[in-house]
């Protein structure tokens, strides 16, 4: 039995999110949460929150035992970019792209 949690539109680049996701893929959830708690990266706290949501979903909806859960799949996809304007010399402007991403976490036994 597998349970999912999804967080969309996170203000984090997909590349930086994948660095954190690769560290916890396939691990037991207690070990994964421990790794995320002590990681200094911004994405670690965001992914930890999504993982806690997936664990709570598994416990509440499916009655799963937390001690046997593992991170089945975790992946980060690119979302829409926020387009911003930065003023430049001689009346010109430059476009600034602020990337977002979607985080998908699946836990199961």
Swiss-Prot record:
Q: Which InterPro entries match?
A: Ribosomal_uL22, Ribosomal_uL22_bac/chlpt-type, Ribosomal_uL22_bac/org-type, Ribosomal_uL22_CS, Ribosomal_uL22_sf
Keywords for this entry?
A: Ribonucleoprotein, Ribosomal protein, RNA-binding, rRNA-binding
Pfam families this protein is in?
Ribosomal_L22 (PF00237)
Segments crossing the lipid bilayer: none
> Record's superkingdom?
Bacteria
Is the keyword Nucleus in the record? no
A single GO molecular function, which one?
rRNA binding
GO biological-process terms attached to the record: translation
Supply the Gene3D superfamilies for this chain. Answer: Ribosomal protein L22/L17
Q: Does the keyword Ribonucleoprotein apply?
A: yes
Cellular component, GO annotation: cytosolic large ribosomal subunit
Partners and quaternary state?
Part of the 50S ribosomal subunit.
Protein family: Belongs to the universal ribosomal protein uL22 family.
Function statement = This protein binds specifically to 23S rRNA; its binding is stimulated by other ribosomal proteins, e.g. L4, L17, and L20. It is important during the early stages of 50S assembly. It makes multiple contacts with different domains of the 23S rRNA in the assembled 50S subunit and ribosome.
Q: Report the PANTHER family cross-referenced here.
A: CHLOROPLAST 50S RIBOSOMAL PROTEIN L22-RELATED, LARGE RIBOSOMAL SUBUNIT PROTEIN UL22M
Tell me the protein's name. Large ribosomal subunit protein uL22
Q: Give the originating organism.
A: Aromatoleum aromaticum (strain DSM 19018 / LMG 30748 / EbN1) (Azoarcus sp. (strain EbN1))
């Amino acid at each position: 039995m597998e349970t999912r949690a999804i967080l969309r539109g996170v203000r984090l680049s997909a590349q930086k999110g994948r660095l954190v996701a690769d560290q916890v893929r396939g691990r037991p959830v207690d070990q994964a949460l421990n790794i995320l708690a002590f990681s200094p990266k911004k994405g670690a706290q965001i992914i930890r929150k999504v993982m806690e949501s997936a664990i709570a979903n598994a416990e509440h909806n499916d009655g799963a035992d937390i001690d046997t859960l593992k991170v089945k799949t975790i992946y980060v996809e690119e979302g829409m970019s926020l387009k911003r304007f930065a003023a430049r010399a001689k009346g010109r402007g430059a476009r600034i792209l602020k990337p977002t991403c979607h985080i998908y976490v699946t836990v199961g036994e």
